[in-house]
Amino acid sequence: EAVEAMFDKQLGIFEGGVNQYIEIEAPVEGATYATGADWARDVDWTIIVTLRTDVFPYRVVAFLRTGRRPWPFMIKNFDDQVDRYGGTSCHDATGLGTVIDDYIKSDAEGVVMTGRDRDSLFTDYILAIEKGEIEAPFITFMEGEHKYATVDDLYGSGHAPDSIVAGAMAYRASKQSGVRVW
């Protein structure tokens, strides 16, 4: 029920297709934002999510699903989105993410998702969704990943869905201070 409440069709309906950049709201002067990314190239998807954080509930204002492209292109997508909205940012620095960390131009926090850090990343994000603290337009790809994720995907041996990782990274970034500078 919380996932269904999070995705509001009145905010827009989008597929979330490959390389479909979705901008629900352009940057607003004085607003605050947080961006998160999950990296993938060959098998899964690189997802970049930006939250507007000076409103309640926080609102997904930009979404990109990409992949099967060279790393420099996807890193540039992330840097461009962070540059456009400003604010704080986090990305998955697990595995190849540590290499990517060396190429990101923005001041993003690289988060290694292991052990207690991984658990708290997902727990905090899930609690925010359950408390109605995050809303998003109905993005079919993102909604499906959120709706069908299992406990094993997040806390066990399964694979955490890409849009959940990106959303959790954006939510984590929202807990850091950051005001857009014009």
Which residues make up each language-model segment?
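Catalytic-loop motifs flanking and including active-site residues across diverse enzymes
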Residues: 44, 97, 121, 162-166
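ATPase catalytic-site recognition across NTP-hydrolyzing enzymes
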Residues: 1-37
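Gly/Thr-rich phosphate-binding beta-strand-loop-beta motif of the actin/hexokinase/Hsp70
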Residues: 27-53
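Proline-centered turn/helix-capping motifs that create local helix->coil transitions or kinks
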Residues: 2-3, 45, 133-138
